[in-house]
Amino acid sequence: PAQDIYSIMRAFNSFDVYRNNENKFIVKTYRAGLINELKNLNVELVLSEKFETFWKQMSNFSTSEDLKLPEGIHAEFREYQTKGFGWLWFMYKYGLNGILADDMGLGKTLQALAVVQKAKEEDGPAPTLVICPTTVVFNWESEIQKFAPTLTTLKLAGVDRKQFFKEIPNYDVVITSYALVRRDINKLKEYNFRYVILDESQNIKNAMSQTAQAVKKLQASHKLALSGTPIENK
């Protein structure tokens, strides 16, 4: 029926589906929710084996009992932290970006460090950029020293920070502030990061702000936003 065709075309248009050179329709991973909508419209789908596995795992997500915490993390994880880490690792494996939103004091930094450490152990070293409020920079340094001491850390702060830009590829974690990322974006955007982690990410909730615009210019395989209180998560 014409109505069904209209519904299918509307779904394709709204979910950024496009056709490649092999005449196949391509769906971005983060638009995977389209699958259910198309199935409800009785569209016959042929999915790649990798995407089929991803879709099944995402639809019935639970932290695998086989998933081990990284060896370099020195901490006892509570059950909810293990689940959070499992979700972050799932997103990492499938190239997804995400938000870890939880009340303050429940270990978001630890969970983020765990996935950074796990990625290093599984895939080798690559720099992660952590952007946080100036008042939290020391906390990140302290947490890394305590929970992930094998991660090498570079803090970009002070008037002499620019001389260290060339060292960025040699470190596991690079820490800077929202205030400085605005000033240094022309240099920072030259580097390819494994992760860009935004702590207290409400700092970029205004998409038109200079800070948000600067962050959008950063190159990273994965982006993770951390947010702390219910009012900030809205």
Region locations from a protein language model:
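Charged, low-complexity intrinsically disordered regions
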Residues: P1-Q57, P125
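ASCE P-loop NTPase motor core, strongest for the SF2 helicase catalytic module
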Residues: E44-K234
